[in-house]
Swiss-Prot record:
Keywords: Ribonucleoprotein, Ribosomal protein, RNA-binding, rRNA-binding
Domain of life: Bacteria
Presence of keyword rRNA-binding: yes
GO molecular function: rRNA binding; structural constituent of ribosome
HAMAP family with a match to the protein in the record: Ribosomal_uS17_B
Summary of subunit composition and partner proteins: Part of the 30S ribosomal subunit.
Protein name as it appears in the record: Small ribosomal subunit protein uS17
Pfam families, per the entry: Ribosomal_S17
Family affiliation: Belongs to the universal ribosomal protein uS17 family.
Gene from which this protein is expressed: rpsQ
NCBIfam families recorded: PRK05610.1, uS17_bact
Provenance organism: Bacillus mycoides (strain KBAB4) (Bacillus weihenstephanensis)
GO biological process terms on file: translation
Length: 87
């Protein structure tokens, strides 16, 4: 059970929910440049498993690393932190 706590947990924004039971999450983070020391923003997209299709486009979600669920899915949806405002 203690190994579950070592899994990666990321917070990001849903950029695609068009697939069945799958969302694409954009995670933005910062890296420090090795020579100049400036913080540089970079982003990465992860596909995550959404069993109930509850996450919608623009939501802020938390995803956790899990066993491989498909060729590209390695994460699952933990919770929806903030729902998107629909205008």
């Amino acid at each position: 059970m203690s190994e579950r706590n070592q899994r990666k947990v990321y917070t990001g924004r849903v950029v695609s929910d068009k697939m069945d039971k799958t969302i694409t999450v954009l995670v933005e983070t910062y890296k420090t440049h090795s020579l100049y020391g400036k913080r540089v923003k970079y982003s990465k997209k992860y596909k995550a498993h959404d069993e109930q299709n509850q996450a919608k486009l623009g939501d802020i979600v938390k995803i956790m690393e899990t066993r491989p669920l498909s060729a590209t899915k390695r994460f699952r949806l933990v919770e929806i932190v903030e729902e998107a405002v629909v205008i």
